[in-house]
From Swiss-Prot:
Distribution of this protein across tissues and organs: Expressed by the skin glands.
Species of origin: Xenopus borealis
Keywords from the UniProt entry: Antibiotic, Antimicrobial, Fungicide, Secreted
Subcellular location, principal: secreted
Protein name: Caerulein precursor fragment B3
Annotated GO CC locations: extracellular region
Coiled coil spans: none
Family stated for the protein in its record: Belongs to the gastrin/cholecystokinin family.
Function: Has antibacterial and antifungal activity.
Amino acid sequence: GLGSLLGSLFKFIPKLLPSIQQ
């Protein structure tokens, strides 16, 4: 459902952020 989709995004975003900041 939508909740699991949002959960996946919130787990995925922190992995992207370090590569963006560096």
